[in-house]
């Protein structure tokens, strides 16, 4: 019991970090300029900066559309937009579970950063860093791609997410990953789920995107 009480503040701090990341993915993950965000998001950002959080501010529709790029830079690729959207939703769901004490804090797997970089390397990004959030700025005037801005996946995650969500070392045992199945159907029909694979000795949590009616479409090896 004492141990559970000791870990609760750390989980809450990590959940606040996830909240910041969730907002960043909606604000700049798709390169939407920060000034275009609603007043609610600016208030939530300020609350995070002072260590206060109003949960009622979280479910605002304005943050659900990553992939909004400045017109002169062109549209984002469907793959990158979809990946960022699922990552945003997954982190938001993770944030709720952390606040409830159902899940413990885990850093991102380095493989997730590599997939993010590979998926979005030709897409436009805001700049080398999206932090600090309270700084009023939009995307840089020139249209730079992920590949031009970041050296690799690790550089991407560290530059973009900073202290808000740490990245585990390659091959680390305890980390959070995301696996997105590119399946037909609208986004509303897809559901992000957290799946832990018990076979592996490594305690990795995978956020698997699959249809709600599916029963585990296999990316695992057969018997």
Swiss-Prot record:
UniProt xrefs under InterPro entries: Folate_rcpt, Folate_rcpt-like
PTM info: Not N-glycosylated.
Domain of life per record: Eukaryota
Signal peptide span: 1-30
UniProt keyword list: Cell membrane, Disulfide bond, Extracellular matrix, Membrane, Secreted, Signal
Keyword Ubl conjugation attributed: no
Record's bilayer topology term: Peripheral membrane protein
Residue ranges of the TM segments: none
Any one GO molecular function term: signaling receptor activity
Pfam family, one: Folate_rec
Disulphide linkage map: 73-143, 80-120, 113-157, 126-139
The keyword 4Fe-4S belongs to this UniProt entry's keyword annotation: no
Any one GO CC term of the record: external side of plasma membrane
Location in the cell: Secreted, Extracellular space, Extracellular matrix, Interphotoreceptor matrix; Cell membrane
Chain's role: Riboflavin-binding protein which might have a role in retinal flavin transport.
Similarity annotation: Belongs to the folate receptor family.
Protein name stated in the entry: Retbindin
Organism: Canis lupus familiaris (Dog)
